[in-house]
Regions:
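P-loop NTPase catalytic core of nucleic-acid-dependent motor ATPases
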Residues: 48-167, 175-176, 226, 230
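AAA+/SF3 P-loop NTPase mechanochemical coupling elements
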Residues: 151-157, 191-209
């Protein structure tokens, strides 16, 4: 479902008042006809429960955006290993494990956000956008911290992977608390404009990229963030990054 809209009974009838159905004395509006229909679909509420059946509730899970098939993504993998992780096997193994867990265990969160810190044009966005494309509508890219920690956050209700591109936290303690809760808490409060707050199960995995030296509120004992200092060996190499995208768009 691309989006969910809430309407009162009166608003529903008014919205479809110009869509008549039936004939003669049975002629009525589409809204009234649907409300009176014995076979109409109705739910106790909405949930986001990846890979689960939740009787009586509308599950917003739409699965993956792609079907698995054999292909060649060697350029992408090489980029992650040698540029993102600077050929550090321990770092690349952890990052690949984190990414694999996003796919294999969608309903579980590791409680760790991945932070890519490095200069512009080093390929941070290539990693995040290509990986996020696996999840379709359950992936979102945001560019401001307020999109994650602000009051109106209905865009997060059905998200598995959130990519915060060049978003950083400048000492805002309230936003810091919201951010850390998003990484570790089992539920998330979703607020839509003009509607009551709804509690959803939290399935968000957070990816952050920035060229700022101070990106996230992580102290010496912080364990919520896995910070990677990205290499710049391919900085602004359009041919190299274009080759990665071309391979991924050709079955990679």
């Amino acid at each position: 479902y691309a989006d969910i809209t809430f309407s009162s009974q009166a608003d529903l009838i008014a919205r479809y008042s110009n869509c008549p159905v039936g004939r003669g004395q049975k002629r009525t509006s589409a809204g009234k006809a649907w409300l009176a229909h014995t076979d109409r679909r109705q739910y106790e509420g909405i949930v986001f429960a990846p890979g689960e059946e939740v009787p009586g509730y509308l599950n917003l899970d739409r699965g993956f955006a792609v079907e698995p098939k054999k292909g060649d993504c060697s350029r992408f993998l090489e980029h992650v290993r040698n540029n993102i992780c600077k050929a550090d096997e321990e770092i690349s193994d952890y990052l690949f494990t984190w990414m694999a867990d996003c796919v294999q265990n969608r309903s579980r969160r590791p409680g760790i956000a991945v932070v890519l810190r490095g200069r512009q044009g080093t390929g941070k966005g290539i990693l995040c956008s290509q990986f996020g494309s696996l999840f379709g509508q359950h992936f979102i890219q945001v560019s401001q911290a307020s999109h994650l920690t602000g009051n109106f956050n209905s865009h997060l209700k059905d998200k598995l992977v959130v990519y915060a591109d060049e978003a950083f936290w400048a000492g805002d303690k309230k936003a810091e608390g919201v951010l850390k809760a998003m990484i570790t808490e089992d539920t998330i409060q979703i607020e839509m404009k003009g509607k009551d707050v709804i509690t959803f199960r939290n399935h968000i995995r957070l990816l952050v990229s920035s060229n700022h030296s101070w990106v996230v509120p992580a102290g010496n004992e912080e364990r919520r963030f896995f910070v990677i200092d990205v290499g710049d060996g391919r900085i602004q190499d359009r041919s190299y990054f274009g080759g990665i995208v071309s391979q991924m768009n050709s079955g990679g």
